[in-house]
Amino acid sequence: MPQRLVDLHTHSSVSDGTEAPAALIASAVRAGLDTVALTDHDSTAGWSEASAAVAGTGLTLVPGMELSTRLGLNSVHMLGYLFDPAHPGLVAETARLRESRLHRAERIVERIAADYDLTWGDVLAQASSGATLGRPHIADALVAKGYAPDRSAAFAGILHWRSGYYEPHEAPSPLIGVRLIREAGGVPVIAHPATRGREPNVSSEGFEALVDAGLLGVEIHHRENTTAGKARLLELARRHDLIVTGSSDYHGDGKPNRLGENGTAPEQLDRIVDAATGWVPIRG
């Protein structure tokens, strides 16, 4: 029997992806996936549409989210799977994060507009109704105005964190993020923590603290993790018996990442499902 294809990190137009949740499900089916997780930034607004879209497809949906957290100057993303989307603490924190993202984006656009012909309306035109607004939408507006050839180039140039236009964002600590996901019955997995140029995002000591707080997994097989970083993460996962995941971090046309380019072993997915108490996978 061929091994199941499992991709546990994707984004829809609810956050910074380019495909609506239903369209993302259709793309996952075309890509031959058996299981896909929807993990929009700080939002569960796409769960309902994606859950309806899997009906009759044979695809399994793992509802999730990519929660923004911050450790000093480092942005640390925390994937949460199969948590209760109505958990009061998590609902309050994600609402605060979305509001913070919005005001941050407004301030960045104000700075850019001093040097470039860019308006807030240009940015809004790049986002779907109700989307969690952020820097990717500013990048798309810069591309539309001809100031960058694609989203990646916009982030490497005008939106680079060392540019004069950068604005840091407010977010809870990774420890708080882990605890919130666990309290909501979910499974916290730290996302791509050995990203090229920022590795390590979390020190070995920081990992110890996260594990003590309830971290259950680490996303290792991801195109942005360095080779050396993956080796270090595998050792940490072995030492702490953490769930090991792999994924595409698919954004539709927003990034070159392709569905299923990295995957999660079925037995690791089973560990996630077994550990969750807040929600269940949706089987199409």
What kind of region is each of these model predictions?
Residues 53-211, 263, 268-284:
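Extended substrate/RNA-proximal surfaces in nucleic-acid metabolism proteins
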Residues 258-262:
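Extracellular/periplasmic loop regions
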Residues 1-74, 159-160, 172, 178-179, ...:
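An N-terminally biased module of ancient metal coordination in phosphate/nucleic-acid-related enzymes
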